[in-house]
Amino acid sequence: MSYLEAIILGLVQGLTEFLPISSSAHLRIAGLFMGGDPGATFTAITQLGTELAVVVFFRKRIGKVLSAWSRSLRGGMPKGDPDVRMGWLVIIGTIPIGIAGYLFQDTIRSTFRSLWIVAIVLIVFGILLGLADRYSRSDRLEKDMTYGHGVSIGIAQALALVPGVSRSGATTTAARAFGYSRPVAAEYSFLLAVPAVFGSGLYELVKSFDETGQAGAGQTAVATLIAFIVGLAVIAGLMRYISTRTFMPFVVYRVALGVVLLVLLGTGAIAA
């Protein structure tokens, strides 16, 4: 992988991580034009850049949650405090993806990366997002979120281990299905992703510095930095967008991309 290709993949990661269109699917597709799949390890490590963008953008909220949660363990904060509850909601919501990632890590690296699977789940989960966003109530706020909902949204996040599902798309779909407003759904989705993505990214980084697909350490670092810069801008833009608009443009894009992939695969224009 050249540095130019690393920059392009970093741009793709940064542009697509927070939109409900699946960054891993787009990295997989981009690999078609760059001589091969960049790999699950490369994807996991570059996601560290976009999750660092989440930490920077939500630094005040994350700081409050961490402070309140840690103080509650010592009896210094009531368990019903909103920030304490959010801390527990993030923890319990992270458990499903931790279990699934450990149990299915080999399948994630191989079978799940088939473009046939990517195309199908782009369409299916795009339709689910559209239905949840269109027909669900939108009046539930963060204070209404139950631990049961947190676990359910966490299970949705675990499904995003399959490229094409989209971490933000799956968690937002689940939250919208439970009736939470778009800003609440998006913020919880972002906060929920932090421990999961940092965990998987650091695990892959420590596990092997030479298992980053065709990318070397330098190229991976460049892609991660680009993903951070672009991702920070995308978060800000998305939070403004969803305050007044729906997810329907992303639904249309997902379905269209999935259909195009199926046609290209069916005609033999591209290989799975």
From Swiss-Prot:
One of its GO terms (molecular function) is undecaprenyl-diphosphatase activity. Catalyzes the dephosphorylation of undecaprenyl diphosphate (UPP). Confers resistance to bacitracin. PANTHER family: UNDECAPRENYL-DIPHOSPHATASE (PTHR30622:SF4). One of its GO terms (cellular component) is plasma membrane. Belongs to the UppP family. It is found in: Cell membrane. The keyword Protease does not apply. It is an enzyme of class 3 (hydrolase). Its EC number is 3.6.1.27. GO terms for biological process: cell wall organization; peptidoglycan biosynthetic process; regulation of cell shape; response to antibiotic. It catalyses: di-trans,octa-cis-undecaprenyl diphosphate + H2O = di-trans,octa-cis-undecaprenyl phosphate + phosphate + H(+). NCBIfam families: PRK00281.2-1, undec_PP_bacA. It holds the Pfam family BacA. The keyword Disulfide bond does not apply. This is Undecaprenyl-diphosphatase. Bacitracin is thought to be involved in the inhibition of peptidoglycan synthesis by sequestering undecaprenyl diphosphate, thereby reducing the pool of lipid carrier available.
